[in-house]
Amino acid sequence: MQFEDWQTAPDPKVIWKEKQKARELRKTQWWKNRRACNSCYYCESPTPAKKLTMDHVVPLARGGSNIKSNLVPCCKSCNNQKKNLLPIEWKEYLAIIGKKKE
């Protein structure tokens, strides 16, 4: 985390509320439909719907929210590796390790 990120980091209470919203969204038909693709948004590997996790494209810790356009299904491996990276940082990482998301 850069010093500039620390200055603008979201309030922990805001992050907690957003995580609560995400838990509720996981129970919705909308999320079930999103997982029905049975593949990871990032690496495109075939993944059973029940094993797909919810990822914030722009992480909560970097100012993201639970708007539906910011939530994607991804495999645990990608979610664990992506952590708090922004989309451009994640694409650079994927290019380095040889996995591409066009």
PLM-predicted stretches and their roles:
Residues 2-42:
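Short, charged surface segments at domain edges that flank catalytic/cofactor-binding sites
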Residues 38, 52, 69, 73:
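Cys/His-enriched microdomains
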Residues 49-50, 81-85:
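Short, non-ligating residues that shape and space the ligands of small metal-coordination modules
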Residues 53-59:
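Histidine-centered catalytic micro-motifs used for acid/base chemistry in nuclease
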Residues 63-81:
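Short beta-strand-alpha-helix junction that forms the catalytic/metal-binding core
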Residues 99-102:
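Short acidic DE-rich linear segments
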